[in-house]
Curated annotation (Swiss-Prot):
Enzyme Commission identifier(s): 1.14.19.28
Transmembrane segment boundaries: 11-31, 39-59, 160-180
EC class of the enzyme, as a word: oxidoreductase
Gene: desC
PANTHER family per record: ACYL-COA DESATURASE, DESATURASE 1, ISOFORM A-RELATED
Name under which the protein is recorded: sn-1 stearoyl-lipid 9-desaturase
UniProt source species: Anabaena variabilis
Length: 272
């Protein structure tokens, strides 16, 4: 792998040790004494809440791209769910993703896939990124919101509070599966959108980058694997544009529409 940057990137040791600690914690899930079906159930439920409702629906389609609107209380709830995925605070996440779309697969892209699969999957997170300084410029719509500021500042403590709740409800096995294993699982599912869907699959549209549609990533990440479609129509709340491109998050948006909780839903114009 070659990282095409003008200067050698510096390792972010805080991030590196943080990710290492979480992965070590996740391995404790494979110790038989930490296994229970209840703990696995908690992990699966939180996988959907934090990865599906939080990251995919909340952070990504609602806040980053504003592909639909919800009442403010629901937006805050979805952003809280995304914050519990422990992928940084919402302001940083949204800003970084907007930068990615502006510079997709070019050197300023934080996870430029031309720098290799490893880099776009996790490498970019363990090095200091110059794009971090641009986040304020890309998040003016949310940066002054006190709820977003609170979640950005205290996302680690919010995760700790969830861990303590799980410890109270089900003991150490709930913490291992519901926090450590679940966080790492959702990490890699999310990261596959940055790596696998810029390498594997098919391209329906010329989006000006290497984005692809990858069915198995779509399964893991609630429809986010139809990434070439998304890059072609970034504003669209629906990513799976063909009948066989199952998009669970789009189905969720449709349900919210029926309930009167999603309005101004934007859809792709495939004639473009």
């Amino acid at each position: 792998m070659t990282i095409a940057t003008s200067t050698k990137p510096q390792i972010n040791w805080v991030n590196t040790l943080f990710f290492l600690g979480l992965h070590i914690g996740a391995l404790f899930a494979f110790i038989p004494s930490n296994f229970s079906w209840a703990a696995v159930g908690v992990a699966l439920l939180l996988y959907w809440i934090t990865g599906g409702l939080g990251i995919t629906l909340g952070f990504h389609r609602l806040v980053t791209h504003r592909s639909f609107q919800t009442p403010k209380w629901l937006e805050y709830f979805l952003v809280l769910c995304g914050t519990l995925a422990c992928q940084g605070g919402p302001i940083e996440w949204v800003g970084t993703h907007r930068i990615h779309h502006l510079h997709s697969d070019t050197d300023p892209d934080p996870h430029d896939s031309n720098k290799g699969f490893w880099w776009s999957h996790i490498g970019w997170l363990i090095y200091h990124s110059p794009s971090h300084a641009d986040v304020p410029r890309f998040t003016k719509d949310i940066a002054e919101d006190p709820v977003y500021q609170f979640l950005q500042k205290y996302f680690i403590f919010i995760q700790i509070a969830l861990g303590l709740l799980l410890l109270y409800l089900g003991g150490w096995s709930f913490v291992v599966w519901g926090v450590f294993f679940r966080i790492v699982w959702v990490y890699h599912c999310t990261w596959l959108v940055n790596s696998a869907t810029h390498k594997f699959g098919y391209r329906t549209y010329d989006a000006g980058d290497r984005s692809t549609n990858c069915w198995w990533v779509a399964v893991l990440v609630f429809g986010e694997g139809w990434h070439n479609n998304h890059h072609a129509f970034q504003y669209s709340a629906r990513h799976g544009l063909e009948w066989w491109e199952v998009d669970l998050t789009w189905m969720t948006v449709q349900l919210l529409q029926i309930l009167g909780l999603a309005t101004n839903v934007k859809l792709a114009d495939k004639k473009q």
